[in-house]
């Protein structure tokens, strides 16, 4: 019989401050954190006819690691201030006669701030991909009978990864400010030589970093190789002491873990480095952490929780209990991994052994394959209704399961003689399944969709034909209008209509009409004669209406003109060939036509120009031909 008693209750306030500073030129090797990308697939198969059945979980995860290494040889003056404050609010101790003590404490939110100032720094960085592949397989089997039976399960986990990076160059400017704030409670249970701890954060941790770097780097390299192996096995014995449905199951188990880490780095440094630091170390048994992840999906529910602690214990334990309807088991694996030290010019930090505890709660298998489809029918005067179960593959981002949903199809009697249900599986999303559960899924939406599609097709065809006709009419109208415009331009703007207009008189066609009207009546003839005095083109083709030629003018006295004419002839004879018309009408022809005292045309032939007449010698003619050219030579 155990008796419990409370020892005491205390309220303490604790404050811890860490400060690091150095201001000498330094050279160091830096490695950034690793980014991990997981690609996982899980499958849930529910039981037919039940939306809350418990299907098995099969999960495969393939993570990919991307590591960025920073290597730099820096010459800088850096100051680092680190402060951390934690306050113990309450503490309670209790003990029992079975030599078991319970200790619990609660802390208020703790805040840690880091400030790093680096005036000048050059960074050569390179990114090297690291690949990792891990597989977790969970097997579960059970057999229930009145005699003792055996149920076994095995879980194995293995992973390995390696990395090799090479430097590259990068020049950036940054500064770093990091703040961490969280509030947590701590509960401890310990007895004799074992101790466990659970750390549950009540508020999320807030980290706000900002970087400013300006550095100069030398090339370095490092290599990481890690091999991890986890194996476990256990056996169970099931006993049925009575005919009742409850059963007790105990799983003794053993686990084994092997972890190997290798880390090597090299760097070159030519500067001295000094560090003045003050730090506080928390023992491995003083804190622990628990991370819980809960996943709920329709129509099944499952929960997975994992916890990690720093308790250096390697004694696993497991227990299980089951009844007729549900079964679950819980296993705890404890393994310890050691990390190797770092080789660099910076003093290495203290490596703390870490221990991880994984707790899983899988659910029993439940699978159903829809091989046979039962069809029932109902009919009225015109329609036959078929009822059957359609297989659906419901797929979501985190869940995939197969289920059967009742489906109804209405077919006219005149269109079908026999009916067979489709055997293929239809793939749908979770929203479809949710609508089916809510009763808001319209089974006749396909018929409405077909009618809508028919109307859309008819409207598209009619619109296309109408659009083509409208385009043809517009093109025809433009062509007709252009043809009329060309015809109007030919009638009004042709060359024949411009002949009379350029002299200020009507066109030739109007003159023809006027001459014909003048021949019909005397009055019109008089009007035409009056108009002909002003318009020389009015009687152009009326030869009968033309009058007699004008009388010959009286003769002129040319005696006094002979002297002046000879002078004028001699003065202008040299310039007679300046123009082309001088060769066809010369003063010699003018003189011959005016010697008789009349101004009429002479009967002599036209003079060809000086040097071409018959009254000059052959030598003079050649000389004149060489000095000037006449009208005929110009034409040739």
Swiss-Prot record:
It is a single-pass membrane protein. The keyword Transmembrane helix applies. Belongs to the TDA7 family. This is Topoisomerase I damage affected protein 7. The modification Phosphoserine is found at residue 628. The keyword Transcription does not apply. Residues 1-33, 87-109, 238-271, 299-326, 339-362, 510-551 are annotated as: Disordered. There is a cross-link at residue 512 (Glycyl lysine isopeptide (Lys-Gly) (interchain with G-Cter in ubiquitin)). The chain crosses the membrane at residues 457-477. Its main location: membrane. Keywords: Glycoprotein, Isopeptide bond, Membrane, Phosphoprotein, Transmembrane, Transmembrane helix, Ubl conjugation, Vacuole. It is found in: Vacuole membrane. Residues 1-18, 510-541 have a biased composition (Polar residues). Glycans are attached at residues 4, 257, 492, 557, 562, 626. Residues 19-33, 87-108 have a biased composition (Low complexity). It comes from the Eukaryota. One of its GO terms (cellular component) is vacuolar membrane.
């Amino acid at each position: 019989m155990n008796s419990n008693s409370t020892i005491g209750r205390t309220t303490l306030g604790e404050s811890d401050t860490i400060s690091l500073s150095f201001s000498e030129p330094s050279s160091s090797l830096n490695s950034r954190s690793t980014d991990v990308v997981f690609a996982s697939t899980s499958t849930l198969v529910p039981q037919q006819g039940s939306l809350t059945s418990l299907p098995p979980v099969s999960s495969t995860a393939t993570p990919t690691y991307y590591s960025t290494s920073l290597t730099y040889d820096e010459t800088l003056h850096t100051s680092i201030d680190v402060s951390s404050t934690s306050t113990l609010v309450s503490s309670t101790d209790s003990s029992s006669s079975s030599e078991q003590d319970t200790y619990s404490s609660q802390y208020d939110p703790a805040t840690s701030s880091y400030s790093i100032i680096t005036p000048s720094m050059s960074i050569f960085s390179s990114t090297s991909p690291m690949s990792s592949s891990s597989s977790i397989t969970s097997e579960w089997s059970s057999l229930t009978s009145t005699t003792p039976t055996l149920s076994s399960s095995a879980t194995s986990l293995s992973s390995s990864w390696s990395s090799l990076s090479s430097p590259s160059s990068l020049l950036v400017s940054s500064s770093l400010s990091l703040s961490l704030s969280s509030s947590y409670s701590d509960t401890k249970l310990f007895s004799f030589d074992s101790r466990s701890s659970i750390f549950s954060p009540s508020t999320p941790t807030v980290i706000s970093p900002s970087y400013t770097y300006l550095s100069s780097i030398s090339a370095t390299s490092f290599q990481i190789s890690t091999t991890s192996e986890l194996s476990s096995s256990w056996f169970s014995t099931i006993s049925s002491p009575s005919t009742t449905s409850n059963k007790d199951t105990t799983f003794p188990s053993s686990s084994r873990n092997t972890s190997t880490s290798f880390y090597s780095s090299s760097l070159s440094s030519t500067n001295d480095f000094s560090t003045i630091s003050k730090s506080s170390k928390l023992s491995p048994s003083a804190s622990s952490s628990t991370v819980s992840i809960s996943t709920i999906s329709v129509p099944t529910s499952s929960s997975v929780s994992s916890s990690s602690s720093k308790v250096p214990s390697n004694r696993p334990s497991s227990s299980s209990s089951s009844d007729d309807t549900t079964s679950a088991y819980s296993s705890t694996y404890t393994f310890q991994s050691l990390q190797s030290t770092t080789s660099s010019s910076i003093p290495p930090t203290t490596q703390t052994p870490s221990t991880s505890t994984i707790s899983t709660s899988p659910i029993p298998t439940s699978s159903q394959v829809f091989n046979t489809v039962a069809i029932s029918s109902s009919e009225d005067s015109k329609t036959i209704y078929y009822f059957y179960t359609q297989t659906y593959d419901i797929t979501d981002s985190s869940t995939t399961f197969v289920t059967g949903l009742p489906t109804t199809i209405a077919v006219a009697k005149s269109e079908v003689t026999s009916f067979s249900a489709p055997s293929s599986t239809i793939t749908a999303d979770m929203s479809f399944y949710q609508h089916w559960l809510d009763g808001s899924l319209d089974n006749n939406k396909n018929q409405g969709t077909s009618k809508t599609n028919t109307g859309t097709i008819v409207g598209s065809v009619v619109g296309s034909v109408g659009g083509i006709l409208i385009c043809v009419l517009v093109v025809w109208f433009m062509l007709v209008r252009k043809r009329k415009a060309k015809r109007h331009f030919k009638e009004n703007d042709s060359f024949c209509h411009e002949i009379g207009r350029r002299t200020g008189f009507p066109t030739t066609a109007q003159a023809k009409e006027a001459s014909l009207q003048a021949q019909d009546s005397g009055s019109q003839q008089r009007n035409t004669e009056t108009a002909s005095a002003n318009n020389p083109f009015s009687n152009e083709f009326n030869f009968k209406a033309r009058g007699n030629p004008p009388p010959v003018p009286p003769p002129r006295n040319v005696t006094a003109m002979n002297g002046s004419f000879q002078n004028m002839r001699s003065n202008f004879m040299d310039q007679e060939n300046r123009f082309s018309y001088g060769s066809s009408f010369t003063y010699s022809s003018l003189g011959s036509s005016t010697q008789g005292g009349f101004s009429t045309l002479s009967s002599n032939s036209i003079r060809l120009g000086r040097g071409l007449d018959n009254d000059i010698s052959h030598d003079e003619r050649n000389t004149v031909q060489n000095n000037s050219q006449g009208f005929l030579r110009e034409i040739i």
